[in-house]
Amino acid sequence: MEDKSLVTLKKKTFEVSKFSNLGAIELFVDGRRKRPKYFHRRRETVLNHVGGKKSEHKLDVFDQRDYKMIKSYAFLKIVGVQLVVTSHLPADTPGFIQIDLLDSRLTEKRKKGKTIQRFKARACDNCSVAQYKVEYSISTQENVLDVWKVGCISEGVPVCDGTYPFSIEVSLIWVATDSTRRLNVEELNSSDYIEGDFTDQEVFGEFMSLKQVEMKTIEAKYDGPYRPATTRPKSLLSSEDVKRASNKKNSS
C-alpha cells in the first residue's frame, strides 16, 4: 500500500505545477558538501515534418544559463524522458515512426550505448506519448550543451508534399548533483520537479512508481535500416572517471 503522504504530494504536484515553469528548484542536501541538488524539467519541440530517412537533430534542452548553474556540480543526470509524437495522417495510413534519444559523444564505431531511449509508434496514431524513467549520468566536465540528439526515421509512410507530417516533442527531467548514488523513489515522488502534462492522476502515479510506463500501447515492429543498439550502459562513467571528478570538485 502506498504511503498516503506520497499520494498527496504527487496529487499536489500534478494539480498545481505548470509545465511552462522552467525555473530550477533547489531540493535535498547533497552529500559531504551539504548543498542542494538542482532539479529541472525542460520541454523542447524538436522538429516538425520528419523526413523519411535517417536524421539526427540537436536537442537544445540546455542553455548557457543552465550550464552556469550546473558546472560547479560533479554530475548531470537524466532521470526522466517524455516523448510526444503528433501525427496528422488519416487513421488508415500505413507505416511507422521511430524516435531515438542519442548520446552524440558515441561514434558510429561505438553504437552499443548510443541510444539512451527508443520510442516507436504507428504513423496513423494521432498523438503517441511515452514516459520513461532512466538513470543516465555524465560528468559536468563534458560539453553538456551538445551531448544529446534525437534520431528520427519513418518507414513506409506516404510522402505528403515532400514531407512526412509528424511533430516531435521531447521533455527531459534532469538533476545536477555531486552524488553518484541513484535517486530513490521517495525523492522522485516528493519532488516538485515532476511537473504536469500527464493525462490523468492514475497514469502519473504509475509513472512515479514503476521503472518504465508507456502511456499508450505501441504495436510497431520496426525493422528498417536505421537500428542503433537498444542496450545502453547505466552510466558512461567508469569508476575511475567518477573518482577523478569527485576528487576534483572536493579539492576546489
From Swiss-Prot:
Residues 222-252 are annotated as: Disordered. Pfam families: MP (PF01107). InterPro entries: Viral_movement. This is 29 kDa protein. It comes from Tobacco rattle virus (strain PSG).
